[in-house]
Every structure is written in C-alpha cells, then in structure tokens.
C-alpha cells in the first residue's frame, strides 16, 4: 500500500482494486461486496 488515499476504508483492505476504491468513495459499494479474495493478501 503506497498511499493512504488508496485505502477503501478504515477497516478495509488497502490493496483493493481501483474499481472497488472508486465505488467506495461514491458510496456505490465496498470491497467486501464488489470484489473478494483478489487483493486481500499484501
């Protein structure tokens, strides 16, 4: 995780893909519901 602004949320994995991050900022979804298991391990 390079930058804090890339986090999906306070309790979310910061290695989530960009689509998940933008969805979270737009309140359209979260890492848990959008994409699971891809970028969980850092």
From Swiss-Prot:
| Chief location bin | secreted
Gene Ontology molecular function, alphabetical = sodium channel inhibitor activity; toxin activity
Keyword Disulfide bond part of the UniProt annotation: yes
A GO cellular-component term linked to this record: extracellular region
Checking Gene3D superfamilies in the record gives:
4.10.40.10
Keyword flag Secreted = yes
Q: Which domain of life is it from?
A: Eukaryota
**Subcellular location per the Swiss-Prot or TrEMBL entry:** Secreted
Family the UniProt entry places it in: Belongs to the neurotoxin 06 (delta-actx) family.
The record's note on its domains: The presence of a 'disulfide through disulfide knot' structurally defines this protein as a knottin.
Role summary: Inhibits tetrodotoxin-sensitive voltage-gated sodium channels (Nav) by binding to site 3. It slows the inactivation, causes a prolongation of action potential duration resulting in repetitive firing in autonomic and motor nerve fibers. Does not depolarize the resting potential. Does not affect tetrodotoxin-resistant sodium channels. This lethal neurotoxin is active on both insect and mammalian voltage-gated sodium channels.
Q: What is this protein called?
A: Delta-hexatoxin-Ar1a
